[in-house]
Amino acid sequence: ALRESLEKQWKTEQEKKQQMSALAHDIKTPLTIVRGNAELLSETELTTEQKNNITYVLNGTTQIQSYVKQLIDVTKSWNCSDVTYTTVRLEDFFADIKEQALGLVEIYHQKIDWKAGQSDKKVTIAYDPMFRAVMNVIQNAVEHTKENGIIYIDAKEQDDRLTFIVEDSGSGFTKEALLHGTEQFFMDDTSRNGEAHYGMGLFFAKTVAEKYGGGIKLSNSENTGGARVEIFFLSSQETS
């Protein structure tokens, strides 16, 4: 009876994942149509009120597209067959993340305080999902930091464990966010623009970290007073 119950539960979970994956992809097409038509309308003669309405539509579709992308990333992370393991120099992996993070904060007129351990070691990792997971954590920090704020990133490796600590200079996690911030579709309103924010990014980061032998920890930084996220993964490693 226990075995049948577990098999039924597993089957139900698989069906939910398939439905979520299909839904995410199905949303993309009508969303693209809405955005495309809104962009066409914006090029016609409009009143001030109509222009404002079009702007709201475009901003809304941009936000939804971001959520859909994160949802697709999550569903991809469930599929082991899609993962390619790559052997890279640890310094190169850190450098790739630093480069993308610098490009991200530049858009929001922020700065990065970057610290990374020096190592000639090579690591074998699921590069793409791990890279996206770390960038989701950094994106979350960016969204909760005001212009001219600083994002602190500490990247290190020890005992076959890759760890990234990201601290922002925002208002920090609420009590509710500390408890539920990595849950799918968790919402808070502490983002930089004051709008409700969905926690898909941290949910995806947690999903990937746990899949590769690691985890994620949420806290508030003693240094900045902002949010602190520690994400880590296990990796096989060899000296060069």
PLM feature segments, named:
Residues 86, 106, 111-122:
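Conserved catalytic submotifs in the C-terminal HATPase_c
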Residues 168:
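Acidic ATP/Mg2+-coordinating residue in the GHKL
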Residues 214-215:
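Conserved glycine-rich
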Residues 59-64:
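Short alpha-helical segment of the dimerization/phosphotransfer core of two-component systems
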